[in-house]
Amino acid sequence: MNVPNHIAIILDGNGRWAKAKGLPRGYGHVKGCANLEQVCYDIKDLGVKYLTVYAFSTENWKRSREEVDGLMKLFRSYLKKCIKISRDNKMKIKIIGDISAFASDIQESIRKLEEFSKDYDELYFQIAMNYGSRDEITRGMRKMAQDVADGKVSPDQITEDTIGSYLDTAGVPDPDLLIRTSGEQRLSNFLMWQLAYTEFYFTDVAWPDFHKAELVQAIEKYNQRDRRYGGVKEE
């Protein structure tokens, strides 16, 4: 089985999964978080080198105060658990997105986690928190515009690679496969620059129920695709 080098996942359906079982939405997020821990081990076992997950978008602040507070509590717990997950998998972890909106203790946990894991190289795990692709591109272009103004970058030398170097994902290869769980079929402002030639896989399975068997199925479907990158397959 040809395993994608980089898999990105939109972790969708936690709340709906809980509601269908007559449980609070927060319980769905707890189960989804626990599943993410296991999927990191599964991804490593399958030989995938890069994993990026959409954990909390810039739009998710619009949810109820109770739900957002619950998610922040969950983030605090999960970031601490990530130390063990990182050690077990020799996994480097980076948080992408604008972390300045989070409470200071969460920001500090992020910095500690990134520092702890910086030298691991068997799996690269990006967690998108307070992330939106339009926001990422806007922030990146502001930095590039400032560098142009300062004479560090010449406008006529700007390429796609230059733009990519100003994004949160700089230095990381674009995803080969995007998985979105729970039946929705849209990007929801996730990695819009990076997904230009990515294969998409949509499943009705909610994130808390998305286990290794579903992951393998997604990879098998990926193997059936003919990735032409805009070209034409030679007969």
What are these regions (language model features)?
Residues 1-235:
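Flexible, compositionally biased loop and terminal segments
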